Amino acid sequence: MAQASNEKPNQPIDKFESMLKTDDVYFFDAEDFEDIIHHYLNNGKIALAKKAIKIGLQQHPASVELKLLEVEVLVFENHLDIAENYLDVLQTLDSTNEEIFIQRANIFSKKDNHEAAVALLNEALGLSENSFDIHSLLGMEYLFMDDFKLAKESFMRCVAFDEQDYSSLYNVIYCFEFLEDFDGAIHYLNDYLERNPYCEVAWHQLGKQYFTKKMYPEALTAFDFAIISDDTFIGAYFEKGKVLEKLGKYNEAIENYEATIQMEDPTSHAYLRIGRCHEQLENDEMAKYYYYHTVHEDPLLDKGWLAITDFYFRRKEYEKALYYINKALNIDGENPQYWKKCAHINSALEKFDQADFAYKQSIDLGNYELPTWLGWADVACQNQDIAGAVHILLQGQEFYPESAEIKYKTAGFQLEMNDMINARISLIDALKLDFGKLELFSSQFPQYIDTDWVRNIVSKVERSLRQ
């Protein structure tokens, strides 16, 4: 039987959990059940939320709010048809309850019908006295629809309602960034900081906008203010370090990265950036020390392995570079950047068969960058496969139809094959695309640049371009 409880009314969760451990049944107000259920839902304890809903409806079978929480759980668990049937019944009981429209919107959102979800949320707005949560949901629906302008406006309303709603603040800035309106973001954040001068989150975001615009002194000031507002804000120290790197102040950058390590468990990203700073300072042993720590901390961080490989590659220690890129490939053989670097190293070692294989792997895994096509063609040429080199360049041309580099290189290889007709077409196309890059052709194919055949083509195209 239900018992009265001497528990304080502000302790319904403790009281409920105590009840679950015994055979007693305590009575709760419907509002208490709502608080208990919200607590469990917010903490991801769905099973306990469902228990609270079941007991709550046994004690308050007419409570629309408890039934709506049951619908919320059904939607979360993707029992959408059952949830819709419940909502149909509830709407006959209370047709002006905005939560009914919100849950219907959630169902449509789950079905990827975001336009219908928006329409229902706008209906809920007309019924609600407190529209804060609805604007947040609208913002998310607009994000799903890639309508970043309307999403930004919705999240701005949330921030205007509660300036401590940092989740919405982040979303506002995300929308500005996606719209590439960095000036708009800077203006918005400065306006926000006029009202909240000690908000470390806003200072941090402002610094990132300045960094994007390469306004490094302003970015540095913003991150300093973020640290003044919260001297344990790790993100501000890390971003400040990146700014100091850009300004060439590598020792100061190291101090900021080390601060993040001292405040929290070390991260591979911090080790990596410290290593790069030491390399810039020509502290080679320290650079290696931190690069090795980077891959020890996170063996799957591709930037770490590439940093060690590049370290040796820049010093022309190609065998060591090859050793480390092969270790990286053993960890992640599906990484196109690893294969591209492997190709560069094998080319430097004049192992052109291996380089050809590595370039092919990189392309097959989705690396379609222009230098990859050009490098692969050069390797094919070194392997005496001129026809293969031309074929590679024609593939690359599909991705870069306006690339003069591809055209000049194609013309040179076609001349090597004595394919004069296609060589003429390729060279004319290259000159029309970028006459100024004729030097690329001259440097790679000096044996042809001074021939009458090439001079005549160059002269004719030059005259046509002047007209």
Language model: regions and residue ranges:
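Canonical positions in the second alpha-helix
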Residues: 56, 89-90, 123-124, 157-158, ...
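Structural marker of alpha-solenoid helical repeat scaffolds
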Residues: 59, 92-94, 127-128, 161, ...
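Canonical tetratricopeptide repeat
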Residues: 69, 103, 137, 171, ...
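TPR/TPR-like (Sel1-like) alpha-helical repeat modules
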Residues: 364, 412-439, 462-465
